Amino acid sequence: MGKKYKESTKLIDRKTLYTPLEAMELALKTAKANFDETIELSIKLGVDPRHADQQVRGAVVLPHGTGKKVRVLVLAKGDRIKEAEDAGADYVGAEEYVEKIQKENWFDFDVVVATPDMMGVVGRLGRILGPKGLMPNPKSGTVTFDVAKAIQEIKAGKVEYRVDKTSIVHVPIGKKSFEVQKLLDNFRVLMEAIIKAKPSAAKGQYLKSVAVSSTMGPGIKINSVKVLE
């Protein structure tokens, strides 16, 4: 355990459930690394992701973005290619990029957007993109003919959330360089989306625990009753 991490843990009472504001302030105070650390939420949900009717997945545009420059690859053809280029996509193409990923193990992108008519080709990448969480999906708005809108939302700070096999959702909500209020705004918008996404099949307590941390900092527990205050 590093010296900076030990110093950070002294600022936190492990038994306390903090208000969102207190937690965001502490997340910034405990971000002591000499780079712009990511501030991330970890939300434990009362769902069993082994069941298809208890999946929690979606996307939301954070009002202040995540602070990360997102590289977008668009797989499209015809008129959609120019539309994607004009909207600010970093890479636009079709089969040539599918082959590049397959043959060269190329991953210089963070999000993939595909038009529905490309999914037959994109389907070949399922085994490669799927485990990395990069496979285009209609639920997250990354399979669409409206590529311009998809790109604009992603560049504006759209984040995807998805419950993992341990029933936890991990989502970045900003950087150490953010003001507390911006983190708080992003936190509230994300929590509203996750609460709305509660599956009808989920029984009992939905928000089991909520914690925030910086890349190198300790977890700070948030009172789940007060997440929308």
Curated annotation (Swiss-Prot):
Signal sequence region: none
Record Pfam families: Ribosomal_L1
GO cellular component labels: large ribosomal subunit
Domain of life the protein comes from: Bacteria
CDD domains: Ribosomal_L1
Keywords carried by this UniProt record: Repressor, Ribonucleoprotein, Ribosomal protein, RNA-binding, rRNA-binding, Translation regulation, tRNA-binding
Function: Binds directly to 23S rRNA. The L1 stalk is quite mobile in the ribosome, and is involved in E site tRNA release.
HAMAP family in the record: Ribosomal_uL1_B
Subunit structure as annotated in this protein's UniProt entry: Part of the 50S ribosomal subunit.
Protein name listed in UniProt: Large ribosomal subunit protein uL1
Organism: Clostridium kluyveri (strain ATCC 8527 / DSM 555 / NBRC 12016 / NCIMB 10680 / K1)
Name of encoding gene: rplA
